[in-house]
């Protein structure tokens, strides 16, 4: 518009400067002025057209910028969705790894065959309980035998005091009998040593059970075999004790018969009486040792019961693990369904 105005001004200024040309053309200045206005009108039209095109272009650029902003927002949203989808994929991969690990653990548990081992262990524990009950019954029988032996010793004491005059003629036989009695005393001491060894073995077994309770499932068969061996050894020792007691009873009967025939040398008889009195505390100590054995056997049975309860708890834990694994399989199926839905949505987009 400014160019058009400047051109109009230049046209008006140039009109009086050329009078000769006016006369030559034969036209009036009014006609000339009309021609200048006609020359300026197309320029204004062109400028208006250019102005309209500029406005159209500006409007087009504005619309394009709005569309570009919308596209950029959609791109940011897509970026967020892809990051969330990647996080979901990582979580799904972690869950699938956990499922694979749990399946491997289940296969390992199946390979170990824990249930069969547990059944074998329960059967062997029942057998050990029966062995312990038999041992307790044999101990009761031994206690009764010991009471009868003590009563026989008391009767022997009374008979020795009444028959003190009959010993003078058979001192040599008494010496040999005393030697035999000393041999029996050594047998009794060896028996006490064996009982002590048995107690030490029981303590060792207890320590081993406390230390190796984690490896109980793998080494239960060997331990039950060792327990059977020790129980059989105990029964053999009890049988040997019974034999020794029967021999003692036979020797006591022989001595009572011989003491009835002895009638002299009262001092030596008193020595034999003191020897019999020395035997009494040893027999009493034997009773004490057997009474100490009873609580140990009871403690063993209690510990076996605790082992049974621990095994039942482990069975419950295994059942709980199975439930968890079934839940994991259902979760895995749901995750697969989610993956399929996400793939379907991505295909739709």
UniProtKB/Swiss-Prot annotation:
Species this chain originates from: Bos taurus
Mode of membrane association: Single-pass membrane protein
Residues forming coiled coils: 183-216, 304-347
Compositionally skewed regions (Basic and acidic residues) per UniProt: 19-30
Post-translational modification: N-glycosylated.
Name of the protein: Inhibitor of nuclear factor kappa-B kinase-interacting protein
Key words of the record: Coiled coil, Endoplasmic reticulum, Glycoprotein, Membrane, Transmembrane, Transmembrane helix
Record-annotated membrane-spanning stretches: 45-61
UniProt gene name: IKBIP
Other remarks on this protein: Shares a common promoter with APAF1 from which the 2 genes are transcribed in opposite directions.
Job description of the protein: Target of p53/TP53 with pro-apoptotic function.
Ranges of biased composition (kind: Basic residues): 1-11
InterPro entries the UniProt entry points to: Inh_kappa-B_kinase-int
Subcellular location field: Endoplasmic reticulum membrane
Keyword Transmembrane: yes
Region Disordered: start-end pairs: 1-39
Any single GO CC term annotated in Swiss-Prot or TrEMBL for this entry: endoplasmic reticulum membrane
Residues bearing carbohydrate: 145, 327
């Amino acid at each position: 518009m400014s160019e058009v105005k400047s051109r109009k001004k230049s046209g008006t200024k140039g009109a009086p400067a050329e009078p000769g040309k006016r006369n030559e053309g034969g036209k009036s200045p009014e006609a000339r002025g009309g021609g200048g206005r006609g020359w300026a009108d197309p320029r204004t039209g062109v400028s208006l057209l250019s102005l309209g095109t500029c406005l159209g272009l500006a409007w087009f650029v504005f619309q394009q910028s709005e569309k570009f902003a919308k596209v950029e927002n959609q791109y940011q949203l897509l970026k967020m969705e892809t990051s969330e989808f990647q996080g979901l994929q990582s979580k799904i991969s972690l869950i699938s790894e956990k499922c694979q690990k749990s399946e491997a653990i289940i296969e390992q548990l199946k390979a170990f065959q824990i249930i069969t081992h547990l059944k074998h262990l329960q059967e062997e524990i029942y057998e050990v309980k029966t062995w312990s009950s038999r041992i307790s019954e044999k101990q009761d029988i031994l206690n009764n035998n010991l009471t009868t032996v003590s009563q026989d010793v008391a009767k022997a004491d009374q008979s020795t005091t009444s028959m003190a005059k009959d010993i003078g003629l058979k001192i040599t036989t008494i010496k040999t009998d005393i030697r035999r009695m000393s041999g029996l005393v050594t047998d009794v001491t060896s028996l006490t040593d064996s009982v002590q060894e048995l107690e030490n073995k029981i303590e060792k077994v207890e320590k081993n059970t406390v230390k190796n309770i984690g490896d109980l499932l793998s080494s239960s068969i060997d331990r039950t075999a060792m327990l059977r061996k020790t129980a059989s050894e105990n029964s053999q020792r009890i049988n040997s004790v019974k034999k020794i007691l029967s021999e003692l009873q036979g020797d006591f009967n022989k001595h009572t018969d011989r003491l009835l025939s002895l009638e002299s040398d009262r001092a030596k008889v008193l020595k034999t009486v003191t020897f019999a009195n020395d035997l009494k505390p040893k027999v009493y100590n034997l009773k004490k040792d057997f009474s100490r054995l009873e609580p140990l056997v009871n403690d063993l049975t209690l510990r076996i019961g605790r082992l049974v309860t621990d095994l039942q708890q482990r069975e419950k834990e295994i059942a709980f693990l199975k439930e968890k694994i079934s839940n994991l399989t259902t979760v895995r199926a749901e995750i697969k369904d989610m993956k399929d839905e996400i793939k379907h949505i991505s295909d739709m987009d």
